[in-house]
A protein has these predicted regions:
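Extracytosolic ligand-binding ectodomains
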Residues: 2-399
Length: 399
C-alpha cells in the first residue's frame, strides 16, 4: 500500500511539473519543433559561398535559439542544396512548404534561383530573408514574404560605374554570364557607365567556362581600358586569366559575384590588382564582426565566406520574428503568416550594422564596398584593400 501511495505521489509531482515548467511534459516532450531552412549551392562550383551561407545560419541558431527554447520549442536548421539551379531551387521550395514546421527560409545565393523559388514560398506565406540576392526583381515584386539584408544591383552597378569614371576609364567592354543576376548587374553597369561618359564598345553574354578565345580575340583588337564581367567567380576567374595570358592589359572590374577567395585560387596572379564591388563587406570592416569570426573559426575550423555574416543576421531576424509570433499566439506554435508579418517589424543591430526593412523588403540602408585584390593567396582574401565604402538607401518602388 505504501508503494502505491508513493507512486501516486510521484505521478502527481510529474503532472504538476509539466504544468509549471514551459515545454516540459512526460518523456521530456516539447511543444514542437520549429525549423529554419537554408537554400544555397552546397555542391558544384559555387559551394564555397553556399556552404558559408549555411554555416552562418547554423551559428546564429546555436547562439540565439534560447528564447524560443524557453518558450517550449526545439529549433532546428534544415539545409537544402539548390545547386545554383532554378529548377532545383523550385523543387526544394515545393518540399519545404509541405513541412509545416519550417517557419522561415534563409537564402539564396543566386537571384535566378531565388526569384522563382520565392513565388513558391509565397503560396504558403513562408517568409524568405535573403543574405545575398541583389537583383532588383527580388523585392520589386513587392511580395509580402520576401526580404533581404543585402543591397541591390541597380545601386551596385551605379557604384561600379562611378568608380570606373574615377579611374579615368574612357572605354569599357562588358561581358555577362547570361544568368538573371549576371546580366542584370552588367546592364546596370553599362547604362550607368554611359551616363558617366564612358564609351561601352561591347556588350555580350556567354555561358562558356573554359575557352574564352572567341570572345577575347576581338576584345584584344579593340583594346578597351576596362573589361567588366557580370557573373560568378567560377567563370570570371578563368576569363580574366585567359585575358592576361593573351596579353590584354585592360583593367578588370566586376560585382559581388566575384567576391570569393576562389577567385584567386583559380585566377592566381592574373587577378591580383583587379577591382570588384560587393554588397558584402569583409567581416573585418564591421565593428561587431570580431567575435563572430572567432566563433565561426572555432566552430567550423575555417574562415567565414562572403555573405556568412549576412546569413547570420538574416537568421537572427528570423528567430526574432518567430519569438514575437509565439508570444502573439499565446505561447503556441505560430503560423507562417504570423512570422512573415513580424519580420518587417524587426529592428536588429546585427553584425553588418543596423537592419530595418522598408515597405517592399529592402534594407533601408545597405552597404556597398569597392575593393582591390592584393594577393594570389586565398588565405589573404580578407586582406583585400578597401577603396570605398558607401551606405545607400534603395530606390523607391516604381508604381
Amino acid at each position: 500500500m505504501k508503494r502505491v501511495i508513493r507512486l501516486r505521489h510521484v505521478g502527481i509531482a510529474i503532472a504538476l511539473l509539466a504544468l509549471v515548467v514551459p515545454g516540459v511534459a512526460m518523456g521530456g516532450q516539447t511543444k514542437g519543433t520549429i525549423k529554419i531552412a537554408t537554400q544555397s549551392p552546397l555542391s558544384g562550383e559555387q559551394s564555397a559561398v553556399g556552404e558559408g551561407i549555411k554555416l552562418g545560419a547554423q551559428l546564429a541558431i546555436e547562439q540565439l535559439k534560447g528564447p524560443i527554447e524557453k518558450a517550449g520549442f526545439k529549433v532546428e536548421l534544415v539545409p537544402f542544396d539548390d545547386q545554383a539551379k532554378p529548377d532545383v531551387g523550385v523543387a526544394n521550395a515545393r518540399n519545404m512548404i509541405t513541412d509545416k514546421d519550417i517557419m522561415a527560409v534563409v537564402g539564396h545565393y543566386n537571384s535566378g534561383v531565388a526569384i522563382p523559388s520565392s513565388e513558391v514560398y509565397k503560396e504558403a506565406m513562408l517568409v524568405e530573408i535573403s543574405p545575398a540576392n541583389t537583383n532588383p526583381v527580388v523585392t520589386d515584386r513587392n511580395l509580402p514574404n520576401v526580404n533581404r539584408v543585402c543591397g541591390r544591383d541597380d545601386v551596385q552597378g551605379a557604384v561600379g560605374a562611378e568608380f570606373a569614371k574615377g579611374l579615368k576609364i574612357k572605354t569599357a567592354y562588358v561581358i555577362h554570364d547570361k544568368t538573371t543576376y549576371g546580366q542584370s548587374v552588367a546592364e546596370f553597369f553599362r547604362d550607368n557607365a554611359k551616363k558617366a561618359g564612358i564609351e561601352v564598345i561591347g556588350f555580350e553574354g556567354t555561358e562558356e567556362k573554359s575557352n574564352f578565345d572567341p570572345i577575347l580575340t576581338p576584345i584584344k583588337a579593340k583594346n578597351p581600358d576596362l573589361i567588366y564581367f557580370g557573373g560568378i567567380y567560377s567563370q570570371g576567374a578563368p576569363l580574366f586569366k585567359q585575358a592576361r595570358e593573351k596579353g590584354i592589359k585592360s583593367k578588370f572590374l566586376g560585382p559581388d559575384g566575384l567576391d570569393s577567395p576562389d577567385l584567386v585560387k583559380i585566377g592566381g596572379q592574373t587577378v591580383v590588382g583587379m577591382y570588384y564591388t560587393t554588397a558584402a563587406g569583409p567581416v573585418a570592416f564591421y565593428p561587431k564582426a570580431k567575435e563572430f569570426v572567432k566563433m565561426y573559426k572555432e566552430k567550423f575550423k575555417k574562415d567565414p565566406q562572403p555573405y556568412s555574416a549576412e546569413s547570420y543576421d538574416s537568421t537572427a531576424i528570423a528567430l526574432k520574428a518567430i519569438e514575437s509570433a509565439i508570444k502573439a499566439a499565446g505561447g503556441k506554435m505560430p503560423t507562417r503568416e504570423a512570422v512573415a508579418k513580424e519580420v518587417p517589424r524587426v529592428k536588429y543591430a546585427g553584425i553588418t550594422g543596423e537592419i530595418e526593412f522598408d515597405g517592399k523588403g529592402d534594407r533601408k540602408k545597405a552597404g556597398y564596398f569597392i575593393l582591390q585584390v592584393v594577393s594570389e593567396d586565398p588565405a589573404k582574401w580578407d586582406d583585400n584593400k578597401l577603396l570605398e565604402r558607401k551606405e545607400i538607401a534603395p530606390p523607391p518602388l516604381k508604381k
